[in-house]
Amino acid sequence: MQELAPRQQQVLAFITGFIAENGYPPTLREIAAHLKISGTLGVSKHLEALERKGYLRREANSSRGIALVGRTDTALSLPVAGVVRAGLPQPAVEDIEEYFAIDRSMVRGGTFFLRVKGDSMINAAIVEGDLALVRPQATAENRDIVVAMVDGEATLKRFYRQRDQIRLQPENPNMDPIIIRPGEGDVAIIGKVVGIYRPLE
């Protein structure tokens, strides 16, 4: 199947999650309301693209005439599990905001998305609003971009271990690193960032 644009991925993920929860597909108005698309014409254009690319088929003269095609082999809907700060640490948000469709080959068990807030990672081409694909793991190698909990608060930074201390380095020259020395704080690696996705709308 052809690759999807970010907005098409969002539409497909919402349809998939809606069907899983309700047992039937959403209407065009429900899709428009959830994704804040102005009017059903915009939704129709996204559905036409998804149908053309082989992800769904549509039935004429039916308000819920959407059927998914070939989902088990190619795509998976992952939760956007909240917000992580690319800046100063902040309390983690763990409510499921939405679902986002991604190629199954990119996913290992437990992988999830977090929405980026802040600009501390701009030199790594990670900006506010991006979706960070996070693979859960408790360890990291130097230079890995990680989601870490620092004294119970979440942050997204580049990881370095230096002798007996850990440095969480921003990719913004205007921001200082977070240094965790023995006995001065608690840090835990939540996962490694393995991909960045940027909605275009």
Swiss-Prot record:
CDD domains according to UniProt: S24_LexA-like
One BP term from GO: SOS response
Protein role: Represses a number of genes involved in the response to DNA damage (SOS response), including recA and lexA. In the presence of single-stranded DNA, RecA interacts with LexA causing an autocatalytic cleavage which disrupts the DNA-binding part of LexA, leading to derepression of the SOS regulon and eventually DNA repair.
Gene3D superfamilies noted in UniProt: Umud Fragment, subunit A, Winged helix-like DNA-binding domain superfamily/Winged helix DNA-binding domain
Assembly and interaction partners: Homodimer.
Name of the protein this chain belongs to: LexA repressor 1
Gene: lexA1
InterPro entries noted in UniProt: LexA, LexA-like, LexA/Signal_pep-like_sf, LexA_DNA-bd_dom, LexA_repressor, Peptidase_S24_LexA, Peptidase_S24_S26A/B/C, WH-like_DNA-bd_sf
Presence of keyword Transcription: yes
Site (Cleavage): A86, G87
Species the sequence originates in: Geobacter sulfurreducens (strain ATCC 51573 / DSM 12127 / PCA)
Family recorded in the similarity comment: Belongs to the peptidase S24 family.
GO CC annotations, alphabetized: protein-DNA complex
